[in-house]
Amino acid sequence: MYRYEKKGPKRGVALYSYSAEFGLTKTLEDCFEDLHDMGAHGIEILANTHIENYPYPTDEWVEKWWRLCDKYEIVPVEYGNWIDSHVLGDRDLTTEESVEMLKRDIRLAHRLGFTVMRTKMPVINDLLEPVENWKEIIKGALPLAEELGIKMCPEIHTPSNLKGKLVNDFVEFIKETGTKNFGLNIDFSVFRTSFAEGEWVDPNYTPNKPEDIIPLLPYVYCCHAKFIHMSDDFKETTIPYEEVVKTMEDNGYEGYLLSEYEGADKYDEGYEVGQTLRKHHILLKNLLGD
């Protein structure tokens, strides 16, 4: 199993960036090759998109996965999963059924070498507040997560406020349980300060300040390094990357920054996101000095 031991923040890629190309013009190995070429060492996958025959991949597919990780020197960093309580249509899953769904993903994430899961829970409103029984669901899966060394992390995404109720509830849960197997994934969209003319902006959104992340860092096990627009001189023009990354680095963050591209142009015919990802990784290399 390939290991990457660099101290401080590390560079990786969320395969969601390839959403317009994966399965059409790019294979899983093509994505791995891209990551290796840009010097990334970590990967996030979306389980139901990137795992063949999910949730029951064959032994042959799993062997192929490990072969790709070793060949391209890539660490399995974050496994994206959903607790889809609405999957049945006519009724919501019970708490027990949701726990079993989550346990299934924990086992598969462990089988593929991941230590962090981006665990998306069903939400009840535009502020992304989770269903009322989220604590019971997480508690039901915690013993298995502890046994297998998996950290479950809901994604903190725009329009969430890092000082708001949603984040506070998660932090209080961590403190109350004392668990090291539940934490946060901070999506850099929460720091976005610039929007294109005519672009829709959530009325609930107020940009967070880079320093707002400092008290949360003990609970942050992974980050989506969201980016929207890269200039030709390797700057992200909508998010204050220099301030955010420096704040995290100065305050001891050791996890991965997973590049996640959400520019609308990636769905244009013929667009290749790999070139935009390379620009982003030049930015990260310049900031991190690697």
Swiss-Prot record:
<dbReference type="GO" id="GO:0016829">
    <property type="term" value="F:lyase activity"/>
</dbReference>
<feature type="binding site">
    <location>
        <position position="260"/>
    </location>
    <ligand>
        <name>Mn(2+)</name>
    </ligand>
</feature>
<comment type="similarity">
    <text>Belongs to the C-glycoside deglycosidase alpha subunit family.</text>
</comment>
<dbReference type="GO" id="GO:0046872">
    <property type="term" value="F:metal ion binding"/>
</dbReference>
<feature type="binding site">
    <location>
        <position position="155"/>
    </location>
    <ligand>
        <name>Mn(2+)</name>
    </ligand>
</feature>
<keyword id="KW-0464">Manganese</keyword>
<feature type="binding site">
    <location>
        <position position="224"/>
    </location>
    <ligand>
        <name>Mn(2+)</name>
    </ligand>
</feature>
<protein>
    <recommendedName>
        <fullName>C-glycoside deglycosidase alpha subunit</fullName>
        <ecNumber>4.1.99.-</ecNumber>
    </recommendedName>
</protein>
<comment type="subunit">
    <text>Heterooctamer composed of four alpha subunits (DfgA) and four beta subunits (DfgB).</text>
</comment>
<keyword id="KW-0119">Carbohydrate metabolism</keyword>
<dbReference type="InterPro" id="IPR013022">
    <property type="entry name" value="Xyl_isomerase-like_TIM-brl"/>
</dbReference>
<dbReference type="Pfam" id="PF01261">
    <property type="entry name" value="AP_endonuc_2"/>
</dbReference>
<dbReference type="InterPro" id="IPR036237">
    <property type="entry name" value="Xyl_isomerase-like_sf"/>
</dbReference>
<comment type="function">
    <text>Carbon-carbon bond-cleaving enzyme which participates in the metabolism of C-glycosides. Acts on the C6-glycosylated compounds 3''-dehydroisoorientin (3''-oxo-homoorientin) and 3''-dehydroisovitexin (3''-oxo-isovitexin).</text>
</comment>
<feature type="binding site">
    <location>
        <position position="187"/>
    </location>
    <ligand>
        <name>Mn(2+)</name>
    </ligand>
</feature>
<keyword id="KW-0456">Lyase</keyword>
<dbReference type="InterPro" id="IPR050312">
    <property type="entry name" value="IolE/XylAMocC-like"/>
</dbReference>
<keyword id="KW-0479">Metal-binding</keyword>
<feature type="active site" description="Proton acceptor">
    <location>
        <position position="157"/>
    </location>
</feature>
